[in-house]
Regions:
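Acidic, serine/threonine-rich low-complexity disordered tracts
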Residues: 1-29, 72-177
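Hydrophobic, well-structured mid-protein blocks that either form specific transmembrane helices
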Residues: 23-69
Length: 177
């Protein structure tokens, strides 16, 4: 919706090897409802309708919300909670600003970054499991490019790094070298 900047429809169509998954979320903001439908492989389609709040959004919009926040307003330790709409549930996502740091990004160089610790809570409450945090480093400039994500797993951790960028809206002032 161009007036409110709220999502009207979210679709996902995943094909990875032999795995397929399709989902669609249709938002009705005046009624504060979202109708979801999803299908794995050739199994029957599932549907569910759920209530929304002002801080409910799909994963892509949630990430955009985090990137569009004014970095000057962040205070170390400050936390915000949003709600992430998934196919059959709404999860609470808490993110906390950890501070600014210089971060070396593999094959990209050094950057001034904004570091966030994130946790996904249960759908029933704001219950967050200790030790389940994952971390996101965004470029400390107007672009707020996601540079690195680190998430612990049972043995070790998963790391994702940016491998390139182009067509940035603003100059990349966070790059040191």
């Amino acid at each position: 919706d161009t007036a409110t900047l709220r999502t009207v429809r979210f679709t996902s169509d995943i094909h990875e090897g032999g795995y397929t998954f399709r989902s669609r979320f249709d938002y009705d903001w005046p009624a504060r409802r979202v109708a979801t439908r999803w299908q794995r492989r050739t199994l029957p389609e599932n549907r569910k309708e759920m209530a929304l709040t002002d801080v409910s959004m799909d994963a892509v919009s949630l990430f955009f919300n985090m990137r569009s926040a004014d970095a000057a307003s962040f205070r170390v330790g400050e936390q915000r909670v949003l709600q992430m709409v998934l196919e059959d549930t709404i999860r609470h996502l808490r993110y906390r600003f950890e501070g600014r740091e210089v971060k070396k990004i593999r094959n990209m160089g050094k950057f001034n970054t904004l570091k966030f610790a994130c946790q996904i809570g249960t759908s029933e409450s704001f219950s967050f499991t200790d030790g389940s945090e994952f971390f996101i480093w965004l470029s400390d400039d107007e672009n707020k490019i996601p540079l690195h994500l680190e998430s612990p797993i049972r043995v070790g951790s998963v790391n994702a790094y940016i491998t390139g960028y182009k067509g940035l809206k603003y100059p990349l002032t966070s790059k040191i070298r």
